[in-house]
């Protein structure tokens, strides 16, 4: 299904698109009953996921949602949930039992097959654990994240144990990718994930010869790779905000 609705005469910037798609997607899921009381919800990380968390908090305050159990995918998300008094659980807690009803998250890129690159916020491991253990996976993005081929604009993040950084980098270079260790912004040295690992950012120097599914599996087979930012193993429901104020749905309803 490709459905768009509501337009505006004033083009929306990217920040406004992120807010629009976060609010519209959560409202739609609540109206359809996809989001409802007593659910377990995985909450993503990043600049589009955060306003979705806020919208869920709005529904809790109104009473249109109640008694939900939220599983955050990063410390950033956990802090936002605490601010809005959203009940927090771990995926392994007794109430959750390792399985989520739905996960809502943003993306760095999404292609025409609804395959996704995530991990710009270095939370790809927790994000994938949540997404791949959810009955439903919802991606919300602004229109700049939509590409024909993954890797067009965003780097592919790969989480590695520190000891494996050089061996994995060498293998990726042999595969024809350019790769570097992601450097931290407000401290010296590399980004360290919530799990104590490093992030390698890889880019294709030419069109990839492997399919996204094959690349996801091949990367995870390398010794020392914990996880990578390709999400290809789940059916995804996608909401895309556009500058004209419309929100497009790019996959079938649940």
From Swiss-Prot:
It catalyses: aldehydo-D-ribose 5-phosphate = D-ribulose 5-phosphate. The keyword Isomerase applies. InterPro entries: NagB/RpiA_transferase-like, Ribose5P_isomerase_typA_subgr, Ribose5P_isomerase_type_A. Pathway: Carbohydrate degradation; pentose phosphate pathway; D-ribose 5-phosphate from D-ribulose 5-phosphate (non-oxidative stage): step 1/1. Its EC number is 5.3.1.6. The keyword Isomerase applies. Signal peptide: none annotated. It is an enzyme of class 5 (isomerase). Homodimer. It comes from the Bacteria. Belongs to the ribose 5-phosphate isomerase family. GO terms for biological process: D-ribose metabolic process; pentose-phosphate shunt, non-oxidative branch. GO terms for molecular function: ribose-5-phosphate isomerase activity. NCBIfam families: PRK00702.1, rpiA. One of its GO terms (cellular component) is cytosol. It holds the Pfam family Rib_5-P_isom_A. The active site is at residue 127. Keywords: Isomerase. This is Ribose-5-phosphate isomerase A. Catalyzes the reversible conversion of ribose-5-phosphate to ribulose 5-phosphate. Substrate binds at residues 45-48, 105-108, 118-121, 145.
């Amino acid at each position: 299904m490709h459905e768009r609705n509501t337009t505006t005469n004033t083009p929306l910037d990217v920040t406004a698109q992120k807010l629009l798609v976060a609010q519209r997607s959560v409202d739609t899921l609540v109206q359809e009953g996809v989001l409802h009381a007593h659910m377990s919800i995985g909450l993503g990380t990043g600049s589009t996921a955060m306003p979705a968390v806020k919208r869920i908090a709005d529904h809790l305050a109104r009473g249109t949602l109640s008694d939900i159990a939220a599983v955050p995918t990063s410390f950033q998300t956990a802090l936002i949930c605490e601010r809005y008094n959203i009940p927090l659980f771990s995926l392994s807690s007794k109430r959750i039992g390792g399985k989520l009803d739905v996960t809502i998250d943003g993306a760095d890129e999404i292609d025409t097959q609804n395959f996704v690159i995530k991990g710009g916020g270095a939370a790809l491991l927790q994000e994938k654990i949540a997404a791949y253990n959810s009955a439903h996976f919802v991606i919300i993005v602004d229109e700049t994240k939509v590409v024909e081929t993954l890797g067009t604009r965003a780097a592919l993040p790969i989480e590695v144990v520190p000891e494996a950084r050089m061996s994995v980098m060498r293998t990726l270079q042999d595969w024809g990718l350019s790769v570097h260790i992601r450097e931290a912004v407000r401290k010296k040295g590399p980004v360290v994930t919530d799990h104590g690992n490093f992030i390698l950012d890889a880019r294709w120097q030419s069109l990839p010869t492997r399919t996204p599914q094959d690349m996801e599996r091949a990367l995870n087979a390398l010794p020392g790779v914990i996880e990578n930012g390709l999400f290809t193993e789940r059916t995804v429901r996608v909401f895309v905000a556009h500058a004209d104020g419309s929100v497009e749905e790019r996959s079938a309803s649940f």
